[in-house]
């Protein structure tokens, strides 16, 4: 049986899947705007390049 986080929606934590979860399609919600500490020009780039997009983007 698949893990509890791999059903319909993966739980997001620290920019990716929750610890212990194995999900190939897990994605954090898009960020509206990157914070000053996050050197990314857009929400798309932030999600791709920032180490922890869920935390560095509000």
Swiss-Prot record:
A divalent metal cation 4 binds at residues 31, 34, 50, 54. Induction: By cadmium. SUPFAM superfamilies: Metallothionein (SSF57868). InterPro entries: Metalthion_crustacean, Metalthion_dom_sf. A divalent metal cation 3 binds at residues 12, 17, 26, 28. A divalent metal cation 5 binds at residues 34, 38, 56-57. A divalent metal cation 1 binds at residues 5-6, 17, 21. Residues 1-29 are annotated as: Beta. A divalent metal cation 2 binds at residues 6, 10, 23, 26. Keywords: Cadmium, Metal-binding, Metal-thiolate cluster. GO terms for molecular function: metal ion binding. It comes from the Eukaryota. A divalent metal cation 6 binds at residues 40, 46, 50, 57. Residues 30-58 are annotated as: Alpha. Belongs to the metallothionein superfamily. Type 3 family. Metallothioneins have a high content of cysteine residues that bind various heavy metals. Class I MTS in crustacea are involved in the sequestration of elevated levels of heavy-metal ions. This is Metallothionein.
């Amino acid at each position: 049986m698949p893990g509890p986080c791999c059903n319909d929606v993966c739980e997001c934590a620290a920019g990716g899947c929750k610890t212990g979860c194995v999900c190939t399609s897990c994605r954090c919600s898009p960020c509206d705007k990157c914070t000053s500490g996050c050197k990314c020009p857009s929400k798309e780039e932030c999600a791709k390049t920032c180490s922890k997009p869920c935390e560095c983007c509000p």
